[in-house]
Amino acid sequence: MSKPVIEESAEYDNYMDDQKRKEDSYSVGLDKFLDGEVKPVLYDQTKKKKKSDAWKVLYVHFKERDDMVEFCQLINQMIPYNIKETWYPLHHPDARLFGFDDEDPITVDPSLLKPRDKDYGDTTLDVDVNVVTRDDVKWRQYWLDMPEYVQENNEHFRTVHIKFRKKEHFEEFSKRIGQDMTEKTKAIWHPELKVTKNRLLRWVEDGERTLPRHPLYIISKTRYDSMFTSRSLARMQIPHHIVIEPQEEQQYEEALDNFGIRDYVTLLVAPFSNHGDGPGRARNWAWDHSISIGATWHWVFDDNISDFYRLNRNQRIRFESGAGFRAMEDFVERFENVYIAGPQYRFFCAPDQKYPAFVANTRIYSALLIRNDCKHRWRGRYNEDTDLCLRVLKDGDCTVQFNAFLQGKAATQSVSGGNTAEFYHAENSDKISEEGWNAEGTVNKSQMLVDMHPDVTRLVWRYNRWHHWVDYEPFKKNKLKYKPGVNPENKENNYGMRLETNFNG
């Protein structure tokens, strides 16, 4: 146990004070120009949560046109290109004289089964996913002396949403297409896709392992029963710190032995507890700790990241050493104006789509590499990562989000403990049905970001809950600047990573 005497360098700003909000130089809200406070207005706040009339919805993917022809024959339905969703059975059985067997076999016209036009959606409703940069080729001029990165479009033929009115229909459908499914099955491929090979694939290093150059910190609260991020780093034999609160010291001590990770973990007990202001305060304290040990950068992670991946040649494969972190460190340290970087979420990079190796000037989340001389610090109770990145970008500096390296982050609110228990509330309460939004749910955390940056942020209703939308387009003018004397060689450098095809570690 390590109990360093590290004092907080500044009082934490949770951004809940009205006067501080008005004095915030990075917000350009109307209250700066009008007398009196301007209360926030929720965007589309009267929109009700749509109740699905389906018992279940199943996403069915097809690799080829012939696969879809066979599927249509099996379920006896024609699903032309302009149909995105359909019912099974197509007509309500109660309105038919006979059950499932009264259908005349249909003739499937393959020419009508062409794929839908690619549509990346309404970018005005984009939620921190910058699709515009997918085909950006400028990244290639900077991806030098870095690991191989080849990622091309290899998209599936089409996806159809199949809706079921009740369990009986779902079970009949399962028999018809010859696939075993449960009520928890959300998506399938037809024919059934045998996904087995990636389980045995890993990026490994032979001999001495490469370690990250800069210290790593995990901010953790009430997750001593899972410790996903720490277990992942320990499996890669990477030493790291876990910042915890005093009242949970014993539980985390026991967890180190329970999970067999003590050799790689240093517990740091923060000088505060149960403050209710989110992880930003602990992140600032970890920042102070890294400076106290002479570090020039530091990594800070959420505590629910199960694995880290390398994306290359249309495969997302786990890496089992610190080489991926070292490559990211080396890349950003070439530039004089990059202050924050980190890997993209795994679920935002489909293996069959084209992405650049990195995207500059967007939000970095959950796993951040931060330059210690950055003049900004964490603040706010919610969405601190987006706020920190926006302040850096508004200064004309840069952030770098890697697609070549990914993090296997658990979905928001899906893992118990952490901030979920403290102030993130479920969005399925009765208040949504009655009022259209839950005042105690994700709307508060999204609204805070709108208050912080009303010039580039607004509130939107998506996926049955509130989200924030951020326009990163104004920051595309922020250009990466090499440090004087930096001139990377135009060569491939895989940092000793070798693809193991039969990993059993």
Describe these PLM feature segments.
Residues 305-323, 415-432:
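A solvent-exposed, charged loop/short amphipathic helix patch at secondary-structure junctions
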Residues 72-77, 174-179, 229-234, 251-261, ...:
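Short, aromatic/basic amphipathic alpha-helical patches
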Residues 212-238, 244, 248-256:
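Short, well-formed alpha-helical segments that are part of the catalytic scaffolds
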Residues 308-391:
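Conserved catalytic core of nucleotide-sugar-dependent glycosyltransferases
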Residues 207-215, 221-225, 380, 386-505:
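C-terminal catalytic/acceptor-binding lobe
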Residues 2-207:
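Compositionally biased, non-globular sequence tracts
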Residues 242, 297-301, 339-344, 399-403, ...:
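A structural signal for short, well-ordered beta-strand segments and their strand-loop junctions
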Residues 244-301, 306-320:
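Active-site-proximal specificity loops/subdomain of glycosyltransferases
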